[in-house]
Amino acid sequence: MNQKQSNLLTLATRLGVNILNIYDYQNKDSVIKCSCSSHGHIIENTVDYLLKTNFECIECMHLKAMDVTDTTPFFLSLDAASYVSGMSLFNKEGQLLGHKTFSIDKKKDFFERVEELKREIEKIVRENNIQCIILEDIQYQQNPVLFKKLAMLQGVLRYTIINELKVQLITAMADEWRAYNHIYGAKRQDQKNAAIERARAIFKDNIPEDESESIFLGYYGIYVYNNEPQEED
C-alpha cells in the first residue's frame, strides 16, 4: 500500500467508512467501493466524488429521515418568491416533517402577492409554534426589475419574521446551502435537477423542485443554527 492509498484509507475510517478495494485507488477518477460502518451499506463512486461528499452514505441518510419520533415543528425553511415558494417543516433534531409548494396567481398585483405570502407564513408560524425560520438570501440578478422586486419581498419578510413574529431568522445564500448539500451544476436547471435527484435518493419520493430546494436550504440552516451560540431561556 502506498502513502496515497494509506492516507485515503485513514480519512475514510475517520469518516465512518470502510474501503473494500483500496488497491484500486490510483487517481481521483478511480472507482472505489466502500461500506458504511453503521449498517454496512455499499457506497461506490469515484475518489473525486467521494472526497467532495465526505464519503456520505445516502442510505443512512434515508434511514435517519424516515425514523421520526418527534413530530413537533421547530424550523420553517422558505425558498420564497412572489409567485411560487417552496416550504419545509423540520423538528428540532433537523428531521423533515413536511413540505409543500405555495403558489399565487401571477395575475395578481406584486404587492398583493407579497401580502398573501406574508399571511401564509404568519399562519404557519402561529399554528406550528415555529421557533426559527430559514430564508434564502437574494443575489444580484441580471434583470434589475426582478432584483428590485426580490429585494422588496426580502425586506417585507425579514421585517415580519423579526419584528412582528419575533422568531429567530437564519439566512443563507444559494451557493452556501448547495455546497453544504453537495448539489452541483453549471446551469440553474442542472442545479434544480440535482436537488430533485438528491431528494429522491434520500426520501425515495418525487419531490417538486421548489420543495426539494427548500428542504436542502433547511438542512444547511439547521447546521448553522446548531453551530452558532444560542441564547439561554
Question: For each predicted feature, which ranges?
Answer:
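Phosphate- and other anionic-substrate recognition elements at nucleic-acid/protein interfaces
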Residues: 66-233
